[in-house]
Amino acid sequence: MSIQVFCDFDGTITNNDNIMSIMEKFAPPEAEEVKNRILSQELSIQEGVSQLFQFIPTNLHDEIIQFLIETAEIRNGFHEFIQFVNENNISFYVISGGMDFFVYPLLQGLIPKEQIYCNETDFSNEYITVNWPHPCDRLCQNHCGLCKSSLIRKLSDTNDFHIVIGDSITDLQAAKQADKVFARDFLITKCEENHISYTAFETFHDVQTELKHLLEVKL
């Protein structure tokens, strides 16, 4: 049995949700209703996020990148946490509902690209189009967009110990199949609604402390 860590990006590795930051800065007011319908699960994540990015003109590409480079902050303790998982030969994957054009640059030098799974974007038309290279498998019918539970099944064995770290509705399906969940913000609410056991965290120092204890118990 090996330990596999599957970590969200927006609002988890970064302090803020970068998609929401982009929408607040660059999208028209109508985007707010779409966001609320995603959170209430009236819209699937795939449908809702596709609609959100259709509000954003592609000619803002460079401006958006610069905005995120200036404003996105990596959560406290993440650098040390990555060093810890590497030293302990723990498999670590970023499974993000975020977009390639900002996830890769913000994680450059921290996480190898082959350990990052995110959505792809097309800037060839007037508005941003989202492509979905990691859809739901036959065991998930939630139209997740990037399906985190499907990726967990693809990247690990059933007898592995699965750890999920996340903050929002996009992490719920993954949390349902995890052996250990680290949750913050809206994911805490969803875990409680669905009777999913979780450990709350604010920094990756919190996660590292708990994971270190878990390793000691399992060893």
Swiss-Prot record:
Keywords per UniProt: Amino-acid biosynthesis, Hydrolase, Methionine biosynthesis
Q: Do you know which InterPro entries this protein is assigned to? A: HAD-like_hydrolase_phosphatase (IPR050849), HAD-like_sf (IPR036412), HAD-SF_hydro_IB_MtnX (IPR017718), HAD_hydro_PyrdxlP_Pase-like (IPR006384), HAD_sf (IPR023214)
Q: What is its EC number?
A: 3.1.3.87
The pathway where this protein functions is: Amino-acid biosynthesis; L-methionine biosynthesis via salvage pathway; L-methionine from S-methyl-5-thio-alpha-D-ribose 1-phosphate: step 4/6
Q: Which Gene3D superfamilies match?
A: 3.90.1470.20, HAD superfamily/HAD-like (3.40.50.1000)
CDD domains linked to this entry: HAD_Pase
Give start-end of the signal peptide: none
Indicate the enzyme's highest-level EC class: hydrolase
Question: What Pfam family does this protein match (any one)?
Answer: HAD
Q: Output one GO MF annotation.
A: 2-hydroxy-3-keto-5-methylthiopentenyl-1-phosphate phosphatase activity
Swiss-Prot/TrEMBL GO biological process terms: L-methionine salvage from methylthioadenosine
Concerning SUPFAM superfamilies, the annotation shows: HAD-like (SSF56784)
- Catalytic reaction annotation: 2-hydroxy-5-methylsulfanyl-3-oxopent-1-enyl phosphate + H2O = 1,2-dihydroxy-5-(methylsulfanyl)pent-1-en-3-one + phosphate
Domain of life per record: Bacteria
Cited function: Dephosphorylates 2-hydroxy-3-keto-5-methylthiopentenyl-1-phosphate (HK-MTPenyl-1-P) yielding 1,2-dihydroxy-3-keto-5-methylthiopentene (DHK-MTPene).
Q: Which PANTHER family match?
A: PHOSPHORIC MONOESTER HYDROLASE (PTHR28181:SF2), UPF0655 PROTEIN YCR015C (PTHR28181)
Tell me its family: Belongs to the HAD-like hydrolase superfamily. MtnX family.
Tell me what this protein is called: 2-hydroxy-3-keto-5-methylthiopentenyl-1-phosphate phosphatase
Q: Which organism is it from?
A: Bacillus cereus (strain AH187)
Write the gene name.
mtnX
